[in-house]
């Protein structure tokens, strides 16, 4: 039976085995999917050993995505742009192909929730790996403008400069943010620490869409805050998790699983996984 893994540290909380087991059942693919939690300095050795022992593919999560980028034999265009790898496939000719499905998962989930991207004004909070992975897929949807805000403004400026060839992307400090946005995406991990990005409430209006890449059994702090400011459409990152997994499954197996039922099952079981 074909073997797949998710590498991370920590990774015991990962929902990936649950998701991919449901995908396999739905598409009648025979595979097993497990967890690997090597020490940071042992990731390269563990990755090579997994494929040497017959592994077919893996997902890679924090803190190994940048290491994986350097370890694979070949990169997909979207992984090269993202500077990080979250999906690796052993190809038929024995090559380790590195891909990044995070941004595609984000865009798919936004569309599933009816969020219009073409011609929109998007505010992206954060300039780390999650933001980098999202930029190319978001800009491919041709928004009117995409503004990056980050606590360290120089990082936002650098990221905007790297992606300016793909569309109207710019950087702004939190203090100077103003104007109208149709969508705000929080790519920071602030919600995990119970913190909020330093946004002024005036940016929130009834018709704005709010997206937090983090998720939980209850509203994230960012989503709870936005609702309190009058935002009517708020979405957490659970759907993005399922959509990026579906994209990875497609890379590995050549068949695209449906995501709606899997997302429903995941929400139903979130408190026990």
Swiss-Prot record:
CDD domains: NAD_bind_Shikimate_DH (cd01065). The active site is at residue 65. The keyword NADP applies. One of its GO terms (cellular component) is cytosol. It catalyses: shikimate + NADP(+) = 3-dehydroshikimate + NADPH + H(+). Involved in the biosynthesis of the chorismate, which leads to the biosynthesis of aromatic amino acids. Catalyzes the reversible NADPH linked reduction of 3-dehydroshikimate (DHSA) to yield shikimate (SA). NCBIfam families: aroE, PRK00258.1-2. This is Shikimate dehydrogenase (NADP(+)). It comes from Aeromonas hydrophila subsp. hydrophila (strain ATCC 7966 / DSM 30187 / BCRC 13018 / CCUG 14551 / JCM 1027 / KCTC 2358 / NCIMB 9240 / NCTC 8049).
